[in-house]
Structures are given as structure tokens and as C-alpha cells.
Regions:
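Hydrophobic alpha-helix position signal
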Residues: 147, 194, 284-287, 361
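Extended, domain-scale alpha-helical bundle/helix-rich regions
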Residues: 233-245
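Alpha-helix capping and helix-loop boundary segments enriched in small/acidic/polar residues
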Residues: 181, 214-215, 233, 271-274, ...
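TRNA-recognition modules of translation machinery and tRNA-sensing kinases, especially anticodon-binding
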Residues: 197, 201-204, 216, 224-234, ...
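Short coil/turn segments at secondary-structure boundaries
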Residues: 102-105, 136, 156-160, 204-207, ...
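Class II aminoacyl-tRNA synthetase-like tRNA-binding/catalytic domains
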Residues: 2-231, 397
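Extended, non-catalytic structural segments that build the interaction scaffolds
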Residues: 131-135, 267-272, 345
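Metal-assisted phosphate- and nucleotidyl-transfer catalytic regions
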Residues: 165-166, 170, 244-340, 363-376, ...
Length: 420
């Protein structure tokens, strides 16, 4: 079936298009079928004097959201949704939609988020919802292009593991034949091992799983993480890489996603780099919390309102960061990238000395013998390295001003939702 997408239609040509019945309108002497494809809504115009009455009756019988194919002549019509109309000479019903519909995809009757997620296949037909995922695809494509252009190699790491990557109990256990395993909470250990392998610069875009019982607008249990690790770079250099990536993504989305952004009513403000750096000590002073406390939602909000732009928090207490972060007295070479609304990424200069790593594992109450496969990589020539992990969903939420992180995922997994 050779079809023309609505965005590629040229006036005064014969075309064949296909899509969903968006709306039907009958004004007596003229009828309209609004047909929707991925690119937008097309106006199919049926004047009684130009279109056979049996074809008009056939179109009038169509149910909303039925799938149809239309062949006809394109005419310029500036009042039509995309500046043209199609005078049909053939309308074929490909599949009829049942009634009533689970959602109103015209946007005239709004549904709550849970109802939309329950009927997600319908919800994505809404222009504003579809726009989120067109932009998401652009963001992830540009992340890959940006890192590949800087000599990073894309890798894929295991999502089923035998032990915790970063310690703690935030793991989903699974049955792995005759023994217990877990869904991986981070590719951290594996991307570090690739530094010992000599790949030098790697990245991964893939799912991670956190068994956290949060039920908030900014937490999910399955997340798309953008992870980077680089040999012979320090924390400052990978921070620069991260802020350059963020700016690049904003610029590219603004340039290439004008229609989806318009559907969302969003005008992007491009962040300026370098981002501001503040020490943990300054952050807790702004938030009025004691030394040694992590920043909770209220603290993040207080600091975000003060800074009012993207910023890094640096000079963290070593006790608040994972075992693989390079310590510096009672501090460490770690950083968090923050948006005024929430944390976006965390990273650090890593430990590359095996003896220190074993010491840090024990200090975090983790058994070094459970990390033998990982520690081996540090015994035979591990270079200095640094890296970070960036949440794709949080990047989208803050970029587009979405109210809930679930809006940025086709089928979110949270504390309550495991279907569809």
C-alpha cells in the first residue's frame, strides 16, 4: 500500500493517504472527514456537487477512530488544518472501531492520567501525547549521535545479575534457574570493567530497575538510564561532557521538533554553559539541613528555587556516595547534576586502585568476595576513569515541563502499575 504522509502532501496532485477517522462534520451541502495520521490532521472535503452521494453516505457511516484509506485530489485550502484539502474519489474502510471509545482523542473531553495509561494505545493518538514520544525519540537519537561523535563506543550490559551493583536493598529478586538473581539497578560495574578492557570511552542507553517504594511524580521503578564511562578523564572533564550534552539536546530538539513542541505549547529555553557549581556545604546551608543529610525533595526544591537554573552539586561527603567513588579526606570527587525541579544525573571520579576499592567495599558493609569478578578488573591494569548516569525520563520531564514522570514513558512501571 503506497501512501503519502500528510506532511509530504503537495497541492494539485493525486494522493493516497491512510489514517484514523478523527471527526465527521456534515454541513448540509458539504461534508468533512478529518483524517489523522502521525503527522497531523487532514481535511477530506466532500461537496455534494463533486463527490458521488454513495461515497458521502459511506463516509457518514464510519465510526470515529476507524482506520481508512482515502484516494483523491489535493487542493490548496488555507483554512484547512495543514493548508490543503483532499477531494476524495475513493474511501476504503480498512478496520472499523468499536463504540464507545475508551478515550476522547479529539482532546475535548479530558481524562485523568490513570485512565490515559490504562488505554495508552489510544492516549498516544492525542497530538500532545504523541509529541512527547516524538521528542523522546529525538533526544535518545541525539544522545547517541553526540557521544558517538566524541569517540564513545555503545555497549550493552547484563540486566540480570547475581549481586547488588551499588549495595543496599533496592533490588528486584528474580528466579534464575536454581538460584536467586536480581534485575540490575545500574550498569556501573560493567562499564568500569570496560575501562580495564581498554575500550576507554563507553556509553549505554538502557533500562535499569530500582525497587524503591516511592509513589511520587518523579519516581519510576523501571528507568531508561544514559550511562557514560571514560578512561583518563577526571570528574571535571566528565561534568563538562554532561553539560555540553544537555545543551546539545535542547538545541537539537528546538531545531528539529518545532511541531511537537507546538502541540505541547512549549518554548524551549536553551541552558547556558558552564552550569553553576555549588558545594554540598552551600547546598545544605540554603536548604537548612544538617551536614551528612542527603537532599530530599524539600531540600532540592529550596536549592532549586535559589539557583533557578541547571547546576552541579560537588564536594559531597564520602559517606553519602557509593563505594566506587574516589574519596578525598572526608569528602569525595562526586557530583550531582540538578535541575531546579529535581536531580537529573550523578557521577564521579572513580577509584582505580584495587586495595582502596576493597577497603571502601568493607567500609560500606559489602562483602568483597561477592565482587570478585569486578575486583579482578582492577588487579591487572585499571586506568584512572570517571563517568556518570543520566535519567532520560527526568531529562524529558524537566525539558518539557511535564507534571508527572509517567507521562514520559509509554508503559510506566511504578509502585502500583505493572500493566499494561
Amino acid at each position: 500500500m503506497k501512501l503519502t504522509r500528510s506532511s509530504a502532501i503537495v497541492p494539485d496532485t493525486d494522493v493516497t493517504v491512510a489514517g484514523w477517522v478523527h471527526e465527521l462534520r456534515d454541513l448540509g451541502g458539504i461534508s468533512f472527514l478529518l483524517l489523522r495520521d502521525r503527522d497531523g490532521v487532514m481535511q477530506i472535503t466532500m461537496p455534494k456537487k463533486k463527490v458521488p452521494p454513495e461515497l458521502v453516505e459511506h463516509v457518514r457511516s464510519l465510526s470515529r477512530e476507524s482506520v481508512v484509506r482515502v484516494a483523491g485530489l489535493v487542493k490548496e485550502e488555507l483554512k484547512a488544518p495543514q493548508g490543503f484539502e483532499i477531494i476524495p474519489y475513493e474511501v476504503e474502510l480498512l478496520n472499523a472501531a468499536e463504540s464507545p471509545l475508551p478515550l476522547d482523542v479529539t482532546g475535548k473531553v479530558r481524562a485523568d492520567l490513570d485512565t490515559r495509561l490504562d488505554a495508552r494505545f489510544m492516549d498516544v493518538r492525542l497530538p500532545a501525547t504523541r509529541a512527547i514520544f516524538l521528542i523522546r525519540a529525538t533526544v535518545l537519537r541525539e544522545v547517541r549521535a553526540f557521544l558517538s561523535a566524541r569517540d564513545f563506543i555503545e555497549i550493552q550490559t547484563p540486566k540480570m545479575v547475581a549481586t547488588a551493583t551499588e549495595g543496599g536493598t533496592q533490588l528486584f529478586p528474580i528466579s534464575y534457574f536454581d538460584r536467586e538473581a536480581f534485575l540490575n539497578q545500574s550498569p556501573q560495574l560493567y562499564k568500569q570493567m570496560m575501562m580495564a578492557a581498554g575500550l576507554e570511552r563507553v556509553f549505554e542507553v538502557g533500562p535499569i530497575f530500582r525497587a524503591e517504594e516511592h509513589d511520587t511524580r518523579k519516581h519510576l521503578n523501571e528507568i531508561t538510564s544514559i550511562d557514560v564511562e571514560a578512561s583518563f578523564l577526571d570528574d571535571h572533564e566528565v561534568m563538562e561532557l554532561l553539560e555540553e550534552l544537555i545543551q546539545h539536546v535542547y538545541v537539537t530538539v528546538a531545531e528539529r521538533c518545532s511541531a511537537p513542541l507546538q502541540s505541547l505549547g512549549v518554548t524551549l529555553s536553551i541552558p547556558h554553559i558552564p552550569f553553576k557549581r555549588i558545594a554540598y556545604a552551600e547546598a545544605i546551608e540554603i536548604a537548612d539541613i544538617p551536614w551528612g543529610d542527603d537532599l530530599d525533595t524539600a531540600a532540592e526544591k529550596a536549592v532549586g528555587e535559589e539557583i533557578a537554573e541547571h547546576y552541579f552539586i560537588v564536594d559531597w561527603p564520602a559517606e553519602l556516595k557509593p563505594f566506587y567513588v574516589q574519596p578525598r579526606n572526608n569528602l569525595c570527587y562526586a557530583f550531582d547534576l540538578m535541575h531546579p525541579r529535581m536531580e537529573l544525573a550523578s557521577g564521579a571520579r572513580r577509584i582505580h586502585d584495587c586495595a582502596l576499592l576493597v577497603e571502601q567495599l568493607a567500609g560500606k558493609s559489602l562483602a568483597p568476595e561477592n565482587f570478585g569478578f569486578y575486583l579482578d578488573a582492577f588487579r591487572f591494569g585499571m586506568p584512572p576513569h570517571a563517568g556518570w548516569g543520566l535519567g532520560a525520563e527526568r531529562l524529558l520531564v524537566t525539558m518539557l515541563g511535564l507534571a508527572n514522570i509517567r507521562e514520559s514513558v509509554l508503559f510506566p512501571r511504578d509502585r502500583r502499575r505493572i500493566t499494561p
